Amino acid sequence: MAFRQPNTKELKVIRKALSYYGSGDFLSHYALLVKEGEKKEVYGVSKELYGVIGELNPHYAGVKIGEVGRRFRFSLEGTFWLLRNSRNRVWVNERGEMLFLYGRDIFAGSVERASEFGENSIVFVCNRFDDVLGIGRSRHSSDELSNLPEDKVFVENLVDRGEYLRHQKTYLSF
């Protein structure tokens, strides 16, 4: 599949998402490419690389920052490049971090703090160093956190940094 520029509708969806998460200036430093397959994958590339992509026709280029459809869905790699503010974030303690990286959901007792968001929102799970550990969906609004029992699931794990390790096939030993 060849890369192409995002069309007007896709660019509008992407810009809206970037602005919402405080990364509207991303497009002044990088160019976007769309690779169509089963999904419309969006890649960020340097302006220099963008100039030679058409000549090379590569299979891969840049960093996949997400997928676009009716909405823009950040990839895990994209969150590291794009998230510049504290919107829709949950910060967890060390135990919550470990469990989340093992694929578990976030319990209310593991949350150290949370920015403001509503129930059923997409949230970015961070450790105390502000590293994005993954993406989840809130089961409750941030306002409800203080009233929840510690063993109640607060954020459902959608994707985390440990997922690629769990899905790696290991070789067979004899």
Curated annotation (Swiss-Prot):
Q: Which GO terms describe its molecular function?
A: RNA binding
Q: Which Pfam families match?
A: pre-PUA_NIP7, UPF0113
Similarity comment: family membership:
Belongs to the UPF0113 family.
Biological source species = Archaeoglobus fulgidus (strain ATCC 49558 / DSM 4304 / JCM 9628 / NBRC 100126 / VC-16)
Task: Enumerate the spans annotated as PUA domain.
Answer: 87-161
CDD domains in the cross-refs: PUA_Nip7-like (cd21151)
Name of the protein in its database record: UPF0113 protein AF_0058
